[in-house]
Regions:
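ATP-binding N-terminal substructure of ATP-dependent carboxylate-amine bond-forming enzymes
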Residues: 1-84, 93
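Active-site nucleotide/adenylate-binding loops and adjacent lid/helix of ATP-dependent enzymes
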Residues: 2-8, 72-75, 83-146
Length: 146
């Protein structure tokens, strides 16, 4: 029987639903708070009880990212893999990845100093939206209309 482990740092409806659905489908399932996990560079898969498949559901980008890296290093099958988190958690890398695959996206400028950001704004005009490379939920996003 396949064992699924849902790892979270805040239980929301989705984590409960994933756990409940796995149980209803006849899978062995567990749910673990990532904040209580400790792993070291000598940790072995056989000593950790994460089952066959780990569904990484951390809200904290960096907690989830590095937990995925550790679990993958030990050979666990992780859904929401390190590489996906690394790419999708970084707006610059996401934009470059989408452009490389010819996925249509809004024109995006990357500035590496405040001065170069101002130069881009002066060149392109208004409105503009300034965003940090890392971040979610609208934190640090500044729409500038004029």
């Amino acid at each position: 029987m396949v064992e699924v482990c849902v790892v979270y740092d805040k239980v929301r409806f989705e984590e409960k639903a994933l756990y409940d659905t796995a149980k209803k489908k006849g899978l062995k399932a567990q749910i673990i708070d990532a904040k209580k996990i400790t792993i070291n560079n000598a940790s072995k898969r056989k000593t950790l009880q994460f089952g066959d498949v780990v569904l990484q559901r951390c809200i904290s980008h960096f907690r989830g990212l590095y937990l995925s890296a550790c679990l993958e290093f030990m050979g666990f099958m992780v859904i929401n893999k390190f590489k996906v988190g690394e790419t999708c958690g970084n707006k610059l890398i996401t934009s470059l990845t989408l452009a490389k695959s010819n996925v249509p996206t809004p024109k995006t400028h990357f500035a590496f100093s405040a001065e170069s950001a101002i130069e881009v704004i002066n060149t392109t005009g208004f409105p503009v939206v300034l965003k940090p490379i890392i971040g979610s939920w609208g934190r640090g996003v500044f729409p500038i209309r004029d």
